Curated annotation (Swiss-Prot):
<dbReference type="Pfam" id="PF02195">
    <property type="entry name" value="ParBc"/>
</dbReference>
<dbReference type="InterPro" id="IPR003115">
    <property type="entry name" value="ParB/Sulfiredoxin_dom"/>
</dbReference>
<dbReference type="InterPro" id="IPR041468">
    <property type="entry name" value="HTH_ParB/Spo0J"/>
</dbReference>
<comment type="similarity">
    <text>Belongs to the ParB family.</text>
</comment>
<comment type="function">
    <text>Involved in chromosome partition. Localize to both poles of the predivisional cell following completion of DNA replication. Binds to the DNA origin of replication.</text>
</comment>
<protein>
    <recommendedName>
        <fullName>Probable chromosome-partitioning protein ParB</fullName>
    </recommendedName>
</protein>
<dbReference type="GO" id="GO:0045881">
    <property type="term" value="P:positive regulation of sporulation resulting in formation of a cellular spore"/>
</dbReference>
<dbReference type="InterPro" id="IPR036086">
    <property type="entry name" value="ParB/Sulfiredoxin_sf"/>
</dbReference>
<dbReference type="InterPro" id="IPR004437">
    <property type="entry name" value="ParB/RepB/Spo0J"/>
</dbReference>
<dbReference type="Pfam" id="PF17762">
    <property type="entry name" value="HTH_ParB"/>
</dbReference>
<dbReference type="GO" id="GO:0003677">
    <property type="term" value="F:DNA binding"/>
</dbReference>
<dbReference type="InterPro" id="IPR050336">
    <property type="entry name" value="Chromosome_partition/occlusion"/>
</dbReference>
<keyword id="KW-0159">Chromosome partition</keyword>
<dbReference type="GO" id="GO:0007059">
    <property type="term" value="P:chromosome segregation"/>
</dbReference>
<keyword id="KW-0238">DNA-binding</keyword>
<dbReference type="GO" id="GO:0005694">
    <property type="term" value="C:chromosome"/>
</dbReference>
Length: 286
């Protein structure tokens, strides 16, 4: 193996002699990003070489293991390069290299939330780090680390939806507010099928929570909710015009509450008299 020296070395190696670290957290690479990087490399060259270490048997180098820069290495492969400049880290131990790979990618690469969560988990379980220590090493708040780790409580199906970009981190946080795994799966499906925004997903989640335990056959789309809200506003206005007081209608699941805003007991007496004189509300509203 190369003798330890104080500085790293930039060398040119065969592109096929490089292997990805088993601790590389990134699993998804955008083809669009790779094509943009290829265009940049063809225009100005590879500005920041990947970082590698030697994997040896005795004095013979078997291959070079990536510590950082897999995306650049992949782009060079796709561009048809046969060799690539790399920064060689000298005499770096297995544990140090693995930890460095995880931390380097967390800090520098735009990881998917699931990739980030899995990277944090490996730092904790493989290297025995606490959440506080992980947060310190990667330059993030402890609460951020904890929130990412919570994503791993989601089912593999929902994790895959997040990994593939079908839902966002915001959507995943909303799904986590549901304790029932079946409701989580249902909300995930609705978000994907209806292309819901996070705020719309929150409304559906509240409805699912309120109706938990009952038979739920159909969930409203955002258009349904908008139309329902408009109907409530129209009914509120008609009731207000009839009785002379401000009326507010609130719905929660299949239940609804009608509130009359009164100033004093005299208003209450007048409202009682009005209700008595108008018979059923359905007759008054028709």
């Amino acid at each position: 193996m190369t003798e330890e020296i104080s500085k790293d070395t930039i060398i040119e190696v065969a592109i096929d002699d490089i292997r990805v670290s088993p601790f590389q957290p990134r699993r998804v690479f955008s083809n669009e990003e790779l094509q943009e990087l290829i265009a940049s490399i063809k225009a100005v060259g590879l500005i920041h070489p990947p970082v590698v270490r030697e994997i040896c048997t005795g004095d013979r180098v078997l291959y070079y293991e990536l510590i950082a820069g897999e995306r650049r290495w992949r782009a060079m492969q796709l561009a048809g390069a046969t060799t690539i400049p790399v920064i060689l880290k000298h005499v770096i131990a297995d544990g140090t290299a693995a930890e460095a790979t995880l931390i380097e990618n967390i800090q520098r690469v735009n990881l998917n939330p699931i990739e980030m969560a899995e990277a944090f988990k490996r730092l904790i379980h493989v290297f025995g780090l606490t959440q506080d220590k992980v947060a310190y090493k990667v330059g993030k708040k402890r609460s951020t680390v904890a929130n990412y780790l919570r994503l791993l409580a989601l089912s593999k199906t929902i994790q895959e939806s997040l990994l593939q970009g079908q839902i966002t981190l915001g959507h995943a946080k909303v799904i986590l507010t549901l304790e029932d795994p079946i409701l989580r799966e249902k909300l995930n499906e609705i978000i994907i099928q209806e292309h819901l925004a996070v705020r719309e997903a929150e409304l559906i989640a509240k409805q699912l929570i309120s109706e938990e335990g009952s038979s739920i056959e159909l969930k409203p789309t955002p258009l349904d909710m908008a139309e329902s809200s408009k109907q409530h506003e129209e009914l509120q206005q008609r009731l207000s015009d009839l009785c002379g007081y401000k009326v507010q209608i609130k719905t929660r699941g299949s239940k609804a509450t009608v509130s009359f805003h009164l100033q004093n007991t005299q208003d209450l007496q007048k409202l009682e008299a009005w209700l008595s004189s108008h018979g059923t509300l359905s007759e008054s509203l028709s």
